[in-house]
């Protein structure tokens, strides 16, 4: 059965918060205890740390953090109310809001996870260095593609000047890069840290060639791509919900300060929750552009990001920009 555009973009968007390994889904939370669901990736680091260290205990007694690996599970849970906190791509949250699911964006937890990686020997230092080369981009006609097209336009690079090779998944680009079928690849953190680490034992050392967030500044006048955050649903309505979100974001901000002060210690604390090696969690902190922004405070940056997407395919946001009710 063919996926609807809405569901397709939600599934792809959710997959862009990468799952580097396959994890068993743990869909049953302890009864009546609040749960924050997130991917085993950068945007979840802050939430997982806040839960693990008890920083949310006064606000959300008994709160748990659980990894999701099935976007359909999150979509259905938000719709039914059985899930009321989930870390998702910001545009996936907007899509659900526009479809009437009653969700809001509480915050932004990363200002961008996108990088271009390449063999060190290729000496790619600027976007212009990719002209005439093959660049792997995941998911044609979806977020990474739209971001790259907007950047190429901003830098006056003609669409065919770089030979874009589309892949159907994030991992697919890595073997292509290692065997020389492509010269560089668009990838997200922490997958970038993972492939760089793995390549140290290979004759072909992979490096982080370009930070796409810095290239984005030519498009939006800011180097922040508000890519993902916490989407909240049932239990966060009205003035009481606003107060709860404000308090939650304050806890997250305190958690982020502690994480940045000692990434290795934080990684040791949460590796069990994320089911990810501590050294890779610690390495990814420096490159995940972790932030805690109230969604309403970064609405202009979100709308700039959303407009780039919607101008190329309105279905990715459910047909329109979300109204003010989306931004908590």
Task: Specify the residue positions occupied by each region the protein language model found.
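Short, glycine-/small- and polar/acidic-enriched structural segments
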Residues: 30-157, 164-167, 183-189, 206-210
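Conserved C-terminal helix/tail region of periplasmic/extracytoplasmic solute-binding proteins
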Residues: 303-328
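N-terminal export signals
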Residues: 3, 9-28
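Short, solvent-exposed loop/beta-turn-alpha elements that line the ligand-binding surface or hinge
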Residues: 57-59, 215-223, 291-299
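Well-formed, non-transmembrane alpha-helical positions, independent of function
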Residues: 76-77, 95, 129, 175-176, ...
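Pocket-lining segment of extracytoplasmic ligand-binding domains
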Residues: 91-92, 171-269
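Sec/Tat-exported extracytoplasmic proteins
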Residues: 82, 87, 97-100, 139, ...
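Secondary-structure end/capping motifs
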Residues: 237-312
């Amino acid at each position: 059965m063919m996926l609807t555009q809405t569901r397709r973009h939600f599934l792809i968007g959710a997959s862009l918060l990468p799952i580097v390994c396959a994890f068993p889904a743990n869909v049953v939370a302890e009864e009546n205890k609040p749960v924050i669901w997130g991917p085993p990736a950068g945007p979840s680091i802050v939430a997982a740390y806040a839960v693990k260290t008890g920083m949310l205990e006064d606000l959300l007694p008994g709160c748990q953090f659980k990894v999701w690996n099935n976007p359909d599970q999150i979509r259905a849970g938000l719709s039914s109310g059985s899930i009321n906190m989930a870390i998702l791509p910001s545009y996936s949250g907007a899509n659900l809001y526009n479809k009437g699911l009653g969700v809001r964006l509480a915050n932004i937890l990363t200002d961008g996870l996108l990088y271009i990686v390449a063999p060190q020997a290729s000496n790619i230092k600027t976007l212009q260095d990719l002209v005439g080369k093959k660049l792997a981009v995941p998911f044609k006609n979806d977020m990474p593609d739209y971001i790259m097209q907007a950047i190429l336009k901003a830098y006056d690079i003609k669409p065919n000047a770089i030979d874009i090779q589309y892949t159907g998944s994030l991992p697919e680009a890595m073997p292509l890069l290692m065997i020389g079928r492509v010269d560089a690849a668009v990838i997200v953190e922490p997958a970038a840290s993972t492939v760089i680490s793995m390549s140290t034992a290979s004759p072909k050392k992979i490096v982080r060639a370009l930070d796409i967030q810095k290239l984005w500044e030519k498009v939006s006048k800011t180097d922040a791509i508000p890519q993902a955050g916490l989407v909240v649903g049932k239990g966060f309505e009205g003035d009481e919900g606003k107060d709860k979100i404000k308090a939650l974001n304050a806890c997250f901000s305190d958690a982020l300060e502690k994480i940045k002060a000692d990434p290795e210690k934080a990684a040791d604390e949460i590796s069990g929750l994320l089911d990810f090696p501590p050294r890779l969690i610690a390495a990814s902190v420096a490159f995940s552009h972790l932030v805690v922004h109230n969604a309403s405070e970064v609405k202009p940056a979100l709308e700039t990001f959303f407009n780039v997407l919607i101008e190329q395919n309105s279905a990715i946001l459910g047909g329109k920009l979300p109204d003010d009710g989306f931004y908590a």
